[in-house]
Amino acid sequence: MNRRDVLRLMLTTALAATIWPGSKAASGLVEGRMTKSTMPVIFLAHGSPMLLDSRRWVAELKQWADAMPRPRAVLMVSAHWDQRPVALGATRTVPLVYDFYGFPDRYYQVTYPAPGAPELSSRVRELLKGANTDFMDEADRGLDHGAYVPMKCMYPEADMPTLQLSLPGLDPATVYALGQALAPLREEGILIIGSGFLTHNLRALSAETPAWAAEFDGWIADVLLRNDIDALLDYRTRAPGVQYALPTHEHFVPVILAKGAVSDAHLATTFPITGFVGGSLTRRSVQFG
């Protein structure tokens, strides 16, 4: 058994198996269900494609979505799309991006025909121009698994207009600035979602949670609760165990973008989902506001 098979087996045993039901495609939002409520900004742990096999995790994400006002649209920033200049994804329903390898065939049969969000795309362009941020279009780029997996849990009817935006690289200050540029969207009924993992070391999957993973998880929770932006942006030198928790950084920085999109330091920070999967992967997810 090679390392990929071992990793997949360990993640499989960490999740409670179930069969994910297919979802019904929708043509778009019904006007009567739209809202312009001020939205929170969230960061969520998106798991792997196998998250859809975890009854508990699926239910937690759905309950979280149900507890928030229903957004007019979702702006998704996933760990699995890092491109410079910043790129805007498809504004129509296009095939998903199955950006993973070596999984059973059924994971490549998952569909999520969410409607595009062309109006949101236009608004994001305005905000990026106003912030002097270069951007480009990737008109055929569909949702990757860091986007469609949690969306399928939270909005299973696939009726939520969704736009994916790339990360602008992995520099913390640059990512935070992009979040700041997008901040007005939350006042316009748009749910901004950063999708990743606060710890992401696939070589350290185990039955037990290592001390370094628990320590890092506790550290980032404290930093976010205290609104310590300096520590957040300097996490690579300040965070305990960072070299073990984050051999690479693409899964962490979406939380920096999410925090950047919340200008009011007095808004509540909560953790709707916590705990670990695969030993070292924290499921901690964050709501700002």
Can you name each region flagged by the protein language model?
Residues M1-A14:
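N-terminal secretory signal peptides and thylakoid transit peptides that target proteins
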Residues E126, G130, M160, L170-A177, ...:
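Surface-exposed, charge/polar-rich loops and edge strands
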